[in-house]
Amino acid sequence: MTATLERRESASLWGRFCDWVTSTENRLYIGWFGVIMIPTLLTATSVFIIAFIAAPPVDIDGIREPVAGSLLFGNNIISGAIVPTSAAIGLHFYPIWEAASVDEWLYNGGPYELIVLHFLLGVCCYMGREWELSFRLGMRPWIAVAYSAPVAAATAVFLIYPIGQGSFSDGMPLGISGTFNFMIVFQAEHNILMHPFHMLGVAGVFGGSLFSAMHGSLVTSSLIRETTENESANAGYKFGQEEETYNIVAAHGYFGRLIFQYASFNNSRSLHFFLAAWPVVGIWFTALGVSTMAFNLNGFNFNQSVVDSQGRVINTWADIINRANLGMEVMHERNAHNFPLDLASVEAPVVG
């Protein structure tokens, strides 16, 4: 006797919708996080494209001197940007209905806040969607954990830093030259290059690139040939096969002889954990560093650390960097301040 089990049809439209959202058979997994992710990222992307092309100038410093960022107002792909929300708005939530008109909303840089808040919500939901799909497939959760590093970095520059500085106008502009301007001003005001957490981030990014290149080249160079010399080595493998495609012992032996034995991994799991953890931890630290510098806990300051027996300063490289920082700072918001804060906060020396 044969028993036939039929899949029970969900009685309601809502039930069928739930089944569709959580199905792992879809070409692209939706998930409950995806229900929020899709509209928020579509909104952020659409507004970014429209504003990058056609947004009018924005009064970023709140001093009635609008700065143009869009293509139709004289910029190109390199110089164009979504200009941050005006300092006159500060940290206020500024949706379109809070402004007297759309023109006022555009003048005060409303699109920046709209894009950033939707984008951050969207990428957080993307991270949640990674966890959700892993959970439904019975996988471990580390893909979402790794993605938390760029999410933390984006949150630091687009949300935590403006909160610490008191205004969305201090957030990173959404453009190529705007990003570099943000970096230069950040160095001038916070000496980020002398912050240990930024140094860890640099080691994470560049080290991760090096390790990725080393791993990929070693694996590609130690493939197990399953074909003749007249055929491509790639023809000897099929997706999902049980057999290994490369010889980790050969790769370990090569690298162990190239440097020394214990510089090479002989365990695939520990190797791939290291490849994932190195850049992720580095970027976590950088995001943490930016978040602390947001509240003006800045990089190390070794200015005027060396003096002679008469108390005269002997300039070191730290003093050269400090002079460069001051130079960058006086060029930033040059019409908003008479002097940068570092120069205005001390009494002028007596000359004579």
UniProtKB/Swiss-Prot annotation:
Gene3D superfamilies: Photosystem II protein D1-like. Its EC number is 1.10.3.9. Residues 345-352 form a propeptide. [CaMn4O5] cluster binds at residues 170, 189, 332-333, 342, 344. SUPFAM superfamilies: Bacterial photosystem II reaction centre, L and M subunits (SSF81483). It is found in: Plastid, Chloroplast thylakoid membrane. It holds the Pfam family Photo_RC. It catalyses: 2 a plastoquinone + 4 hnu + 2 H2O = 2 a plastoquinol + O2. One of its GO terms (cellular component) is photosystem II. Tyr-161 forms a radical intermediate that is referred to as redox-active TyrZ, YZ or Y-Z. Keywords: Acetylation, Calcium, Chlorophyll, Chloroplast, Chromophore, Electron transport, Herbicide resistance, Iron, Magnesium, Manganese, Membrane, Metal-binding, Oxidoreductase, Phosphoprotein, Photosynthesis, Photosystem II, Plastid, Thylakoid, Transmembrane, Transmembrane helix, Transport. GO terms for biological process: photosynthetic electron transport in photosystem II; response to herbicide. The record marks 161 as: Tyrosine radical intermediate. The chain crosses the membrane at residues 29-46, 118-133, 142-156, 197-218, 274-288. GO terms for molecular function: chlorophyll binding; electron transporter, transferring electrons within the cyclic electron transport pathway of photosynthesis activity; iron ion binding; oxidoreductase activity, acting on diphenols and related substances as donors, oxygen as acceptor; oxygen evolving activity. The keyword tRNA processing does not apply. Chlorophyll a PD1 binds at residue 198. PROSITE patterns: REACTION_CENTER. Photosystem II (PSII) is a light-driven water:plastoquinone oxidoreductase that uses light energy to abstract electrons from H(2)O, generating O(2) and a proton gradient subsequently used for ATP formation. It consists of a core antenna complex that captures photons, and an electron transfer chain that converts photonic excitation into a charge separation. The D1/D2 (PsbA/PsbD) reaction center heterodimer binds P680, the primary electron donor of PSII as well as several subsequent electron acceptors. 2 of the reaction center chlorophylls (ChlD1 and ChlD2) are entirely coordinated by water. PSII is composed of 1 copy each of membrane proteins PsbA, PsbB, PsbC, PsbD, PsbE, PsbF, PsbH, PsbI, PsbJ, PsbK, PsbL, PsbM, PsbT, PsbX, PsbY, PsbZ, Psb30/Ycf12, at least 3 peripheral proteins of the oxygen-evolving complex and a large number of cofactors. It forms dimeric complexes. Belongs to the reaction center PufL/M/PsbA/D family. PANTHER family: PHOTOSYSTEM II D2 PROTEIN, PHOTOSYSTEM II PROTEIN D1. This is Photosystem II protein D1. The gene is psbA.
